[in-house]
């Protein structure tokens, strides 16, 4: 039975109950290699096939195929590709049972798992007449099913392929979630602005409430609408709490940076590009001392009943009339004089008539 060239041998499981029935109904040490020779894992150009074919046509070689010990002993005298049994469960069980009986224990049942190796044998004169054996593959026979053991390269390669495939899927999924902004940089979470104006915040909350407002349920089922309203309120509260936390952190940052700075006592005057310093009339300490003295004097005047005027600048400003206004008021005639002149003119007019 030849395997398909497109299917790897590591993915094939072969069994043949017909051959098991032809070989006595069960597998043992003397027929396991001949049962394996019927599988697609067997190489017809190996020394096993050559020795079996010679024994069928040469009676002198027939004893070599009657037992597995004689067959493998003959293979060791040949060079080339061969298949041998590396693990015999029947022999192992027999040795274990003999030891158990010697210890007075109950014997155990055999595992019925065979291990067959494919190897290349070469003569080596440099090794003192010993053979150079290179293992090419390993096979397992469990019951009547034959499996090929995967190589180390195959196992590591498949594990690496699985790891790389999983990482590729994760990166492709995460790349769609990555966002970038000049303020926050790269992030996988949605950005929330640091500060929003009250009007914008009100408009945003109104838009969110409009978008999340459920339509009237004509069937009378209000469970869906209540859950939608609860979700909308929870989302709004979470956004508000996050914004408050950001504002508080920004306030602490500004306090730490500019908490020890104050506005200059000497103000600036002018336009941008031509600012000049204006001389203050009095420093803050002097203004405070003058204000304190004025307040104390006013309290003393109230107690004594005197009409001493409050110093200018300490209390309310005094209404002082300028000198120019005084001169004009002195030159102006009184109102009574104007009235008398008018009466005299009226009398003179009546007499002339």
UniProtKB/Swiss-Prot annotation:
Q: Where are the annotated segments for Disordered?
A: 193-231, 296-353
| Coiled coil location | none
Q: Where in the cell is it found?
A: Nucleus
Matching entries from Pfam families are given as: Med6
- Kindly state which keywords UniProt assigns to this record, in alphabetical order: Activator, Nucleus, Transcription, Transcription regulation
Q: Where is the composition biased (Polar residues)?
A: 197-212, 297-307
Enumerate the InterPro entries for this protein.
Answer: Mediator_Med6, Mediator_Med6_sf
**Keyword presence, Transcription regulation:** yes
What GO biological process terms are annotated to this protein in UniProt? regulation of transcription by RNA polymerase II
Record GO terms (molecular function) = transcription coregulator activity
Per the record, its GO cellular-component terms are: mediator complex
Describe its partners and assembly state: Component of the Mediator complex.
Family assignment from sequence similarity: Belongs to the Mediator complex subunit 6 family.
Describe the task this protein carries out. Component of the Mediator complex, a coactivator involved in the regulated transcription of nearly all RNA polymerase II-dependent genes. Mediator functions as a bridge to convey information from gene-specific regulatory proteins to the basal RNA polymerase II transcription machinery. Mediator is recruited to promoters by direct interactions with regulatory proteins and serves as a scaffold for the assembly of a functional preinitiation complex with RNA polymerase II and the general transcription factors.
Q: What protein name is recorded for this chain?
A: Mediator of RNA polymerase II transcription subunit 6
Species assigned in the record: Coccidioides immitis (strain RS) (Valley fever fungus)
Classification from the root reads: Eukaryota, Fungi, Dikarya, Ascomycota, Pezizomycotina
């Amino acid at each position: 039975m030849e395997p398909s060239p497109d299917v790897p041998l590591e993915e094939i499981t072969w069994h043949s109950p017909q051959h098991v029935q032809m070989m006595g109904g069960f597998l043992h040490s003397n027929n396991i290699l001949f049962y394996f020779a019927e599988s697609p894992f067997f190489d017809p150009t190996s020394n096993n096939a050559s020795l079996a074919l010679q024994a069928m046509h040469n009676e002198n070689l027939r004893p070599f195929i009657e037992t597995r010990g004689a067959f493998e002993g003959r293979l060791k005298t040949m060079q080339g590709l061969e298949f041998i049994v590396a693990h015999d469960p029947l022999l192992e069980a027999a040795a274990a049972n003999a030891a158990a009986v010697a210890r007075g224990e109950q014997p155990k049942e055999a595992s019925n798992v065979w291990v067959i190796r494919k190897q290349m044998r070469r003569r080596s004169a440099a090794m003192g007449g010993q053979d150079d054996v290179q293992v090419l593959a390993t096979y397992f026979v469990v019951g009547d099913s034959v499996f090929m053991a995967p190589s180390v390269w195959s196992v590591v390669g498949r594990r690496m392929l699985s790891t790389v495939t999983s990482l590729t899927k994760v990166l492709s999924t995460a790349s769609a979630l990555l966002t970038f902004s000049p303020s926050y940089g790269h992030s996988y979470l949605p950005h929330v602005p640091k500060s929003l104006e009250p009007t914008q915040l009100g408009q945003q909350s109104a838009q969110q409430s409009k978008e999340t407002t459920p339509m009237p349920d004509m069937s009378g089922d209000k469970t869906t609408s209540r859950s939608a309203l609860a979700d909308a309120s929870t989302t709004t509260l979470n956004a508000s709490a996050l914004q408050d936390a950001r504002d508080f952190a920004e306030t602490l940052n500004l306090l730490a940076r500019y908490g020890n700075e104050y506005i200059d006592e000497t103000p600036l005057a002018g336009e941008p590009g031509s600012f000049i310093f204006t001389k203050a009339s009095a420093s803050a300490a002097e203004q405070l001392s003058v204000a304190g003295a004025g307040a104390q004097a006013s309290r003393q005047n109230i107690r004594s009943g005197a009409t001493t005027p409050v110093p200018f600048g300490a209390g309310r400003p005094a209404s002082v009339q300028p000198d120019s206004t005084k001169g004009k008021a002195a030159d102006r005639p009184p109102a009574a004089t104007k009235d008398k002149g008018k009466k005299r003119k009226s009398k003179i007019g009546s007499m002339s008539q």
